[in-house]
Design a protein with these regions (language model features):
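Alpha-helical membrane-protein topology signature
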Residues: 2-209
């Protein structure tokens, strides 16, 4: 047969599709930023860019293959948005939450160096990443108009598919896609809760200037 669609091949394809959807979600987010509808938090996205590199490398070193595309995009995407946040974003290292994020990022690198273990590095990186998401969750609740729902919805789909692309059901491989999916669902839920009229916008996705 020309194509051998066994379970492993399907997982490879799902991982690739998840990466493509994640990439498209970031494109939506970038467009929203350039149109002035979304104002990314500088602290969050710079830390995410840095942690995206750390997580991607440690996740790959932990044995991930099929699911590596999303972590790769989770470095490229946040780096692009972090650069845009210099001009179009808001916030910075001007409050306790942001300072905790910075301290956590530094601590993660130190732990990686001390233990020289990719799994420990991965877990510590995800803990730091969870600190970095706090400013965005807070902003999503206080000012939901400052976040793009459909971009987050797209990343939620990507991370859901990535769950099915997992090649080995072991902690080192499962922890990243589970963490990412939970993070996406929290922000999606907050945005749905705060954006009362979000369902009315479905028919007008391309209508905004």
């Amino acid at each position: 047969m020309l194509f051998n669609f066994d379970l492993e091949n399907i997982k490879v394809v799902l991982g690739l599709i998840a990466g493509i959807i994640a990439f498209l979600a970031y494109i939506i987010y970038v467009i929203s930023i350039l149109r002035g509808k979304t104002k990314p938090n500088r602290a969050t996205w710079w830390i995410w860019a840095f942690m995206g590199l750390v997580v991607g490398l440690s996740y790959y070193a932990s044995g991930a293959q099929n699911t590596i595309w999303v972590p790769f995009i989770e470095f490229i995407g946040p780096l692009s948005i972090a650069l845009l946040s210099i001009k179009y974003g808001e916030g910075g290292l001007d409050n306790k939450t942001d300072l905790i994020c910075l301290f956590g990022a530094i601590l993660s690198v130190i732990l990686w160096i001390i233990f020289d273990n990719p799994v420990i590095a991965l877990v510590s990186s995800l803990v730091v990443d969870s600190f970095a998401i706090v400013p965005t969750i807070k902003k999503s609740y206080l000012r939901p108009e400052g976040e793009d729902f459909w971009a987050w919805f797209g990343t939620g789909i990507a991370d859901s598919l990535n769950m099915f692309a997992v090649e080995k059901f072991i902690f080192a491989i499962l922890v990243y896609p589970i963490y990412m999916l939970v993070s996406d669902l929290i922000i999606i839920f907050v945005l749905l809760l705060r954006k009362k009229g979000i369902m009315k916008d479905i028919s007008f996705l391309g209508k905004h200037d």
